[in-house]
Design a protein with these regions (language model features):
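N-terminal hydrophobic targeting signals that begin at the initiator methionine
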Residues: 1-2
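Aliphatic-rich helix starts adjacent to a transmembrane/signal segment
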Residues: 5, 9-53
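Low-complexity, Gly/Pro-rich coil/beta segments used as flexible assembly/activation regions
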Residues: 46, 50-185
Length: 185
């Protein structure tokens, strides 16, 4: 019997080499994919937080405007007028909350949400702003901002909740911002 020297790889050696090569490529790609997904989630969370903060600032603006428009007495802003214009946001009037469009000219009274759901915000891609203008398209994230105010004689708790469904169709944990505002003294 004569033996021949065989050169090359066996089938098993080739399969193991291909498997190792595939794993060395798949690992970094998986990490990069997770990083990209996390970046998109963080971006949406930032937008949600700033939309909530924008609503808080709008409530403050409307409170300040109502106090400045009504002459006060020695105790400051009149107790009956300090939340004037925000009636649809009071939980005693509209338990579902309201929507505030901070970009509307001559801001109308906030609109009460109906059926337990507020209107979806729209995005103006030209000016890079969110609003409730029906002429603007819906965003892929579909942000929904709900404003609720619980008030007493001299204090109000403003709660803003921003919900959204991301580009992949996953409902994310809502952003909730609470702030106490007070009647001017």
């Amino acid at each position: 019997m004569t033996s021949k020297n065989k050169n090359g790889f066996t089938l098993i050696e080739t399969l193991i080499a291909v498997l190792l090569l595939a794993m060395s490529i798949a690992g970094p790609l998986t990490i990069a994919s997770k990083g990209l997904t996390s970046t998109l989630v963080a971006k949406d969370q930032f937008i949600g937080f700033y939309l909530a903060q924008d609503a808080i600032e709008q409530v403050r603006f409307l409170r300040d405007s109502a106090c400045l428009a009504t002459p006060g007495d020695s105790t400051g802003c009149p107790g009956s007028a300090w939340l004037q214009g925000l009636n649809n946001c009071l939980d005693s009037v509209s338990p579902d909350g309201c929507i505030l469009d901070s970009l509307a000219t001559n801001p109308p009274s906030p609109a009460a949400c109906t059926g337990g759901v507020c209107e979806t915000m729209r995005y103006d891609a030209t000016n890079h702003i969110f609003n409730y203008n029906p002429a603007m398209p819906l965003t892929p994230q579909k942000f929904i901002r709900t404003v609720k105010i619980t008030n007493t004689a001299d204090e109000a708790v403003v709660t803003v909740e921003v919900n959204w469904v991301d580009r992949a169709g996953i409902t994310r944990v809502p952003i909730t911002v609470r702030e106490n505002i007070f009647r001017w003294q």
